[in-house]
């Protein structure tokens, strides 16, 4: 996605309100080797990168969006490095011990990148539902789902483990107008839009005086764990 100041502000509000990224990091943590150098591929503004740091030696956060990386650099903590560029070309000097692809990339692409850049496990976090949640109409997520990932891995004969879980990632709003801007920003329908009344019907009372509205979103996710050694060179082409 193309990051904007507004989309970044929305996500930072949601991340501060919920333990979404912490929950994902906690699921990955037990499977990380000791003192690991972990890559958060397609990190966005780096909320997951920061959440992963307590569980490893170093996190390298990579994203192609300059504004997203600029935002992360403004909130960096010790042990996290932010790099701006294409994952395909920003290979590390030494292979990563682990790589995380959270809601990022086609499965085939992530396998190819991981084979070249990682010597250990890779973690794919995928949506465990089939349609976009913030659109006016029914918009398919296509191949960016857990079901699609499982089909690809089965077809390629790559062994994996999978863990299904949920994490609350609702969106707080300071006003109804902010909620309208959010739905306009994330609506993937080509012709349909939500009215103010339809938007209001999706909202609940906000958690504080600052945030008077809240959009609940218990996100169903799948965590796929794959050993890089199980990916053949032919499959990584």
Short names for language-model regions:
Residues 119-132:
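Conserved beta-strand signature within the Rossmann-like core of class I S-adenosyl-L-methionine
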Residues 35-44:
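Conserved class I S-adenosyl-L-methionine
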Residues 89-94:
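Short conserved loop adjoining the S-adenosyl-L-methionine
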Residues 97-111:
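A short SAM/SAH-binding and catalytic strip from SAM-dependent methyltransferases
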Residues 4-20:
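Class I SAM-dependent methyltransferase Rossmann-like catalytic core
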Residues 45-86:
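Class I SAM-dependent methyltransferase SAM/SAH-binding core
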Residues 164-237:
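Conserved Class I S-adenosyl-L-methionine
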Residues 18-35:
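Conserved alpha-helix/loop element of class I SAM-dependent methyltransferases that forms part
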């Amino acid at each position: 996605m193309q990051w904007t100041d507004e989309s970044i502000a929305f996500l930072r509000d949601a991340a501060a309100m919920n333990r979404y990224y912490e929950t994902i990091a906690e699921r990955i943590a037990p499977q990380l080797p000791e003192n690991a150098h972990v890559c958060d591929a397609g990190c966005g503004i780096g909320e997951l990168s920061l959440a992963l740091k307590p569980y490893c030696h170093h996190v390298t956060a990579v994203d192609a969006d300059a504004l997203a990386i600029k935002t992360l650099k403004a909130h960096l903590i010790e042990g996290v490095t932010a790099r701006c560029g294409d994952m395909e070309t920003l290979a590390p000097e030494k292979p990563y011990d682990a790589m995380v692809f959270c809601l990022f990339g086609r499965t085939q692409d992530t396998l190819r990148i991981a084979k070249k850049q990682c010597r250990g496990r890779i973690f794919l976090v995928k949506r465990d539902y089939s349609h976009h949640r913030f659109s006016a109409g029914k918009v398919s997520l296509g191949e960016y789902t857990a079901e699609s990932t499982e089909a690809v891995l089965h077809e390629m004969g790559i062994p994996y483990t999978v863990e299904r879980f949920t994490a609350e990632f609702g969106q707080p709003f300071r006003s109804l107008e902010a909620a309208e801007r959010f739905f306009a920003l994330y609506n993937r329908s080509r012709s349909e839009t939500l009215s103010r009344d339809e938007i209001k019907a999706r909202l609940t009372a906000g958690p504080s005086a600052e945030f008077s509205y809240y959009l609940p979103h218990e996100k169903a996710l799948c965590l796929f764990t794959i050993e890089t050694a199980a990916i053949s060179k032919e499959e990584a082409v």
